[in-house]
Amino acid sequence: MTVRFFAASLLAAISAPALGQAAPATSAQAPATQAELVPIAIETSLGRIIVALDKTHAPVTTANFLHYVDTHRFDGQNFYRAMHVGDGGLIQGGITTDARKLYAPIAHEPTSQTGLHNVAGAISMANAGAGTARSDFFILASDIPALDATATDPGFAVFGHVTEGMGVVKQILASPVSPTKGEGAMKGQMLEPQIKILKVERVNP
């Protein structure tokens, strides 16, 4: 997964007409079934973000993320992108410097299947199309329903939600960006300096 591909798909997904017409979702969790949640902590240079991964509704995506967590492959990586959408937006991080740390791409779990939604606090996988997600992920600071799956667009797979640390998410989103780095739609969205991910680990519920 490359930053460039995610930029193109995301730009198409959040075009102004789509954002203007979509009704915002109200919950990052599927309400119909009790979820088995796996809590993890993302320790950053700006503070801690606690995320509950939804093993019940997004088992493939959760297992993939935990594979990276349990093998410490996120440790020392960065949040490298802050994309503003209206008064909110999203922050993106993952493995961008060493392809040897990447595992194989995973099957896509669309929001139409999981019942999870791209709302404030949701964690989702970046992708270059269905079945291409690997390590890169993003956390939403606001509802962006246009990132959910539709009949013609697989969207982005949500697999959990922030339970603590939204202040840190918003602080990263508000951090300085380079006016020149980034290609195409990514220009002006690359954090400078990047925000260090010190470690990611499982924590007790």
Q: Where do the protein language model's features map onto the residues?
A:
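Cyclophilin-like peptidyl-prolyl cis-trans isomerases
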Residues: V3, L19-P205
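Bacterial N-terminal signal peptides that target proteins for export
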Residues: M1-A7
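Bacterial N-terminal signal peptides
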Residues: A7-P17
